[in-house]
Design a protein with these regions (language model features):
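Structural motif corresponding to alpha-helix initiation and N-cap regions
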Residues: 11-15, 50, 101
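C-terminal accessory extensions appended to soluble enzyme cores
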Residues: 59, 69, 78-81, 103
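Nucleotide-sugar-dependent
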Residues: 29-54, 58, 66-74
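Short loop/helix-cap segments at secondary-structure boundaries that form the rim of catalytic
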Residues: 1-2, 69-74, 95
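Nucleotide-activated donor-binding/catalytic signature segment of Leloir-type glycosyltransferases, i.e.
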Residues: 1-26
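Short acidic-hydrophobic, aromatic-tinged amphipathic segments that line or gate anion-handling sites
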Residues: 7-10, 64, 75-85
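A charged, aromatic-enriched C-terminal amphipathic alpha-helix characteristic of glycosyltransferases
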Residues: 80-115
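A short alpha->beta transition loop at the rim of the catalytic pocket in nucleotide-sugar-dependent
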Residues: 25, 60-61
Length: 115
């Protein structure tokens, strides 16, 4: 099997990022559990969303997230064991449920529920 992992240590131009995202089979997203924003503790998946989710939707890719990242999305795969365990996962996901219109409707519902 021809398997390679590509990562960057610094920000890359958008066209290069898009090119690699289009070529990718799966996204590995080893995000940190917690961060801080203006001295406020933020927890990814609860009070803060990872941009990796938007990338997975935009490019129609499966994404491996830390096991403790809460997600109901079928394209988010909880990381268990080693990364190698995920390289052979074949999973069909219908990304049409994440169209701009549907995401906007869900966002509006969430915002109005908070008011």
């Amino acid at each position: 099997e021809n398997i390679s992992i590509k990562y960057f240590t610094e920000k890359v131009p958008q066209d290069i990022f898009d090119d690699y995202m289009q070529k990718a089979d799966v996204l590995w997203c080893p995000i940190q559990q917690e961060t801080e924003f203006f001295s406020q503790k933020e927890i990814y998946g609860f009070t803060k969303m990872s941009g990796n989710i938007g990338d997975a939707v935009k490019f129609g890719k499966l994404a491996v997230f830390p096991e403790n990242y809460p997600s109901k999305y079928s394209f988010i795969i909880p990381e268990k064991g080693s990364l190698g365990d995920f390289l052979f996962i074949k999973k069909d996901v219908d990304f049409s449920e994440f169209s701009k219109e549907k995401v906007l409707q869900e966002l509006e519902k969430t915002i109005f529920a908070l008011l």
